[in-house]
Amino acid sequence: MEVTAKLRGAAISAQKVRLVADEVRGKSIERALDILTYSNKKGAVFVKKCLNSAIANAENNNGLDIDTLKVSTIYVDEGITLKRILPRAKGRADRISKRTCHITIKVGE
């Protein structure tokens, strides 16, 4: 049985989070949490939050034993992009893209 958790609208680009997601894909829950705890990437904070939610869902909603769980699927999709304006010299303006992403984690036995 697989249990899903989603984190939508995380304020970080999908490209940066995918680096962290590739590290924990297929690992056991305990190993994945260790990797995320000691990672120095900003995306690790968002992935760890979503993984803890998936663990809680598996334990409380489905009554699964968390010692036997592993990260079966993890993927990161692009969310909405917020467009912002940065004023420059001589009346010009640059566009700034504030990117977001959606993180989906499935844990199973």
From Swiss-Prot:
Residues annotated as transmembrane: none
GO biological process: translation
rRNA-binding recorded as keyword: yes
GO annotations of cellular component type: cytosolic large ribosomal subunit
Alphabetized Pfam families for the sequence: Ribosomal_L22
PROSITE patterns according to UniProt: RIBOSOMAL_L22
GO molecular function: rRNA binding; structural constituent of ribosome
Record-linked CDD domains: Ribosomal_L22
Role: This protein binds specifically to 23S rRNA; its binding is stimulated by other ribosomal proteins, e.g. L4, L17, and L20. It is important during the early stages of 50S assembly. It makes multiple contacts with different domains of the 23S rRNA in the assembled 50S subunit and ribosome.
Subunit structure: Part of the 50S ribosomal subunit.
Family that this chain belongs to: Belongs to the universal ribosomal protein uL22 family.
UniProt protein name: Large ribosomal subunit protein uL22
Organism per entry: Psychrobacter arcticus (strain DSM 17307 / VKM B-2377 / 273-4)
